[in-house]
């Protein structure tokens, strides 16, 4: 009888475990780093330290470095470029560039949200309007 009860309890646990589904956790507002040089990493750190926004989408900071001229920094949201700048290796006006990038990115995100709300083009693909 005890053996029979153990089998029933074990079967109950297996059926209960089979009905459980993992809950997918979404982390809103990620800021990802796709930089490769030291100036790019410094820009990402300075930008992310000062970034205080309630934006729930994901931002990506990309870099195309040049050994001679510096780095081309691009900030994108869902593959849409919202800010671009050129950074010199000597960090000339570095803090001003970071603050300017923060202001321009925030304005671009606000404009983007307004455009999405006003241009309700749900039946069109992104490249059709």
From Swiss-Prot:
The keyword Ligase does not apply. InterPro entries: Curli_CsgE. GO terms for molecular function: identical protein binding. Residues 1-22 form the signal peptide. One of its GO terms (biological process) is single-species biofilm formation. GO terms for cellular component: cell outer membrane; curli secretion complex. Keywords: Signal. May be involved in the biogenesis of curli organelles. This is Curli production assembly/transport component CsgE. It comes from Escherichia coli (strain K12). The gene is csgE.
């Amino acid at each position: 009888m005890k053996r029979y009860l153990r089998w029933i309890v074990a079967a109950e646990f297996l059926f209960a475990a089979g009905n459980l589904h993992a809950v997918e956790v979404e982390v809103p507002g990620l800021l990802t780093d796709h930089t490769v040089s030291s100036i790019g990493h410094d820009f990402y750190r300075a930008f992310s330290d000062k970034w205080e926004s309630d934006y729930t989408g994901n931002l990506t900071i990309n870099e195309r470095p040049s050994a001679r001229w510096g780095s081309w920094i691009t900030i994108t949201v869902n593959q849409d470029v919202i800010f671009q700048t050129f950074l010199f290796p000597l960090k000339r006006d570095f803090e001003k560039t970071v603050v300017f990038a923060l202001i321009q990115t925030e304005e671009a995100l606000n404009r983007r949200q307004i455009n999405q709300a006003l241009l309700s083009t749900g039946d069109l693909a992104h490249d059709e309007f």
